[in-house]
Amino acid sequence: MSYFPWLTILVVLPIFAGSLIFFLPHRGNKIVRWYTISICLLEFLLMTYAFCYHFQLEDPLIQLKEDYKWIDILDFHWRLGIDGLSVGSILLTGFITTLATLAAWPVTRNSRLFYFLMLAMYSGQIGLFSSRDLLLFFIMWELELIPVYLLLSMWGGKRRLYSATKFILYTAGGSIFFLIGVLGMGLYGSNEPGLDLERLINQSYPTTLEILLYFGFLIAYAVKLPIIPLHTWLPDTHGEAHYSTCMLLAGILLKMGAYGLIRINMELLPHAHYLFSPWLVIIGAIQIIYAASTSLGQRNFKKRIAYSSVSHMGFIIIGIGSITNIGLNGAILQILSHGFIGATLFFLAGTASDRMRLVYLEELGGISIPMPKIFTMFSSFSMASLALPGMSGFVAELVVFFGLITSPKFLLMPKMLITFVMAIGMILTPIYLLSMLRQMFYGYKLFNVPNANFVDSGPRELFILICIFLPVIGIGIYPDLVLSLSVDRVEALLSNYYPK
């Protein structure tokens, strides 16, 4: 048992160190860049050390617990703790944020504020994944919005203000329902209001109230995850944001919704989840098909990748709705797998459009000749995204398939039907991704821009791409790397649904 406050340090370090950026000497951007990257690296090494030496995989209970009184009059505590569900997400956050900071190297305008906002997001994300108090969870959920809004509205494309406003309206609207749910949970039933997750797990509610609470939380997660029809902020946001912001959005922000769905709706409201799970599976199946076919009609290649993200989130929703050991592990695997693949596709799309100043597919063609390295990596990650065997996307989708098929909750015919719909979605994925590759990279049409200024990706970009490619291949070949983290915790969670 470690009594050292590891998690508090992990949560506070980025935002505290980030606030010191403004006091660094004004000697160009170099100092600020190196300072930010070293903070991200230090944080990532600290979390890796803490999890390697102080976290027991076999123990399904909460570990590295911390509990400090914060606001005494409200009985509000700073409670942190991690288990198998959150370890993977925290490591993903550290990994992607460090590489996104490296990807943001070319940002020179207001670079101090930019890097500070990235570090503030880092703190909020780790705080969310490790919080053990519902109000703290909500605060971290909200803390995320301000940096993302500023990153979008200050460093984006031509329609950045429109997309940033749309993002904040959607997410703030979802958060109102979240807050009502949090207050409803805290004030129900006991004389002492308290939001400790340990206490709330054992709390039972009247069926109507539980369904209302579940629905309130679900709306908030449906915006973040996103679940159709609340997904329309995502393509606009990804189409306009700077690619390092896109990496954080696709890699981590979307996963917060999935994490909340497992952590709060599944754990704290099991009866409502049992009732709603068939609907979740149906929505997930519709989402896979709908987003894949919408993606096919997008002219802007960034928006095409954004819709592919929405489609892949459908697998996570189905895994969570299947209420099986295999399905839920598959959903967690897909959370991490898409975190790597989605972030990289946006990074590649951003670096390519920065070089060409074009985003519409009909204006492109033949880019593979001046940019062979970008072409190779783009093709490789597109293959990972369309679930090529040997890469992480394939394993994740396969495990979710098995989870749905083995679910005792559904009858055979609905299972067959939903599996068929998922299979159609998996056929549409290669169609829209490969047609995008063909339009961008193949052919002889080299556009009106003088081709002399085309540079292929440099060592910094290749380093980022190879760093992400290794875990994608690693998880694809040996999925137990990730599954071993969550498998005991998932079993403990599902014992509420199927008592032995």
Curated annotation (Swiss-Prot):
It is a multi-pass membrane protein. InterPro entries: NADH_Q_OxRdtase_chain4 (IPR022997), NADH_Q_OxRdtase_chainM/4 (IPR010227), NADH_UbQ_OxRdtase (IPR003918), ND/Mrp_TM (IPR001750). The keyword Thylakoid applies. It catalyses: a plastoquinone + NADH + (n+1) H(+)(in) = a plastoquinol + NAD(+) + n H(+)(out); a plastoquinone + NADPH + (n+1) H(+)(in) = a plastoquinol + NADP(+) + n H(+)(out). The chain crosses the membrane at residues 4-24, 37-57, 87-107, 113-130, 134-154, 167-187, 211-231, 242-262, 272-292, 313-333, 334-354, 386-406, 417-437, 462-482. It holds the Pfam family Proton_antipo_M. The keyword Transmembrane applies. One of its GO terms (molecular function) is ubiquinone binding. Its main location: plastid. NCBIfam families: NDH_I_M. This is NAD(P)H-quinone oxidoreductase chain 4, chloroplastic. It comes from Agrostis stolonifera (Creeping bentgrass).
